[in-house]
């Protein structure tokens, strides 16, 4: 199980954060689970009006994240799924998406929750999608990570008393 050793994050007083979720459209059953998990996590954190945007595929996530980071969002969550095929396309997409999202976060100071599944099989993706029978909920985890990081950034930018 890849989730072994995951931290238990405690996130409080974040209901005022502006959070955007960007989700790709490939592999709709997996994506529906990821989006549902992300929205559920936001609701549990008291963030009831997130922005939800859809993009064609995972490769489009970084450019939309970059624009949103410049529009006052406190955290962004990128959701997608890339499943290995018989060509190097998988490697190029995974590397481009990962590098692009990290670059957005580092350059803008806005945390980007990484909820992009990079799997060898559809079964692996379904097992991480947060749907019935899944062992993990990566949409929920990506939100928690992004919001927890935004809360940390907010705490270090506030004046010390």
UniProtKB/Swiss-Prot annotation:
UniProt-recorded name of the protein: 6,7-dimethyl-8-ribityllumazine synthase
Catalysed transformations (reactions): (2S)-2-hydroxy-3-oxobutyl phosphate + 5-amino-6-(D-ribitylamino)uracil = 6,7-dimethyl-8-(1-D-ribityl)lumazine + phosphate + 2 H2O + H(+)
EC category: transferase
Record SUPFAM superfamilies: Lumazine synthase
An annotated GO cellular component: cytoplasm
Organism (species): Streptomyces coelicolor (strain ATCC BAA-471 / A3(2) / M145)
Binding site for (2S)-2-hydroxy-3-oxobutyl phosphate: 86-87, 128
Family per similarity comment: Belongs to the DMRL synthase family.
Residues that hold 5-amino-6-(D-ribitylamino)uracil according to the record: 26, 58-60, 81-83, 114
Keyword check for Oxidoreductase: no
Keywords in alphabetical order: Riboflavin biosynthesis, Transferase
Pfam families to which the protein is assigned, alphabetical: DMRL_synthase (PF00885)
The protein's annotated pathway: Cofactor biosynthesis; riboflavin biosynthesis; riboflavin from 2-hydroxy-3-oxobutyl phosphate and 5-amino-6-(D-ribitylamino)uracil: step 1/2
Transferase listed as a keyword: yes
GO BP terms, alphabetized: riboflavin biosynthetic process
Superkingdom: Bacteria
Function per UniProt: Catalyzes the formation of 6,7-dimethyl-8-ribityllumazine by condensation of 5-amino-6-(D-ribitylamino)uracil with 3,4-dihydroxy-2-butanone 4-phosphate. This is the penultimate step in the biosynthesis of riboflavin.
Gene field: ribH
